[in-house]
């Protein structure tokens, strides 16, 4: 479970990414545009997830061999950093998906206001 303070920082990261998306690309004009953007972002999450699963597990397996052989030397970091890096990439891609969701929610809310 993620800590409360970390959850707050995650929310701040999503808000910041949302503001950056809006600043660079504006708001969505319709649901077709929103769908296309979120589909692309979700595909990037899937790619990052596959990379994480492959690279992270490979490095974790190598790390486990070192642990079993009681060979914990300076090279251990060479196996931990790729896990960190691929997890970081996956987290960044997920934040982008969350930001795009916020943009799409704004479009939905705007349409609801127009109906009222």
Model-assigned labels for residue ranges:
Residues 1-116:
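Flexible "arm" and connector segments at domain edges
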């Amino acid at each position: 479970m993620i800590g409360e303070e970390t959850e707050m920082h995650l929310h701040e990261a999503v808000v910041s990414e949302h503001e950056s998306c809006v600043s660079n690309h504006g708001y969505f004009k319709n649901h077709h545009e929103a769908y296309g953007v979120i589909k692309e972002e979700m595909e990037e999450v899937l790619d990052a997830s596959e990379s994480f699963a492959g690279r992270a597990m490979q490095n974790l397996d190598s790390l486990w061999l070192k642990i079993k052989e009681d060979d914990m030397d300076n090279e251990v970091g060479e196996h931990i950093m790729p896990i960190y890096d691929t997890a970081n990439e996956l987290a960044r891609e997920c934040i982008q998906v969350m930001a795009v969701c916020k943009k799409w929610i704004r479009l939905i809310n705007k349409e609801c206001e127009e109906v009222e």
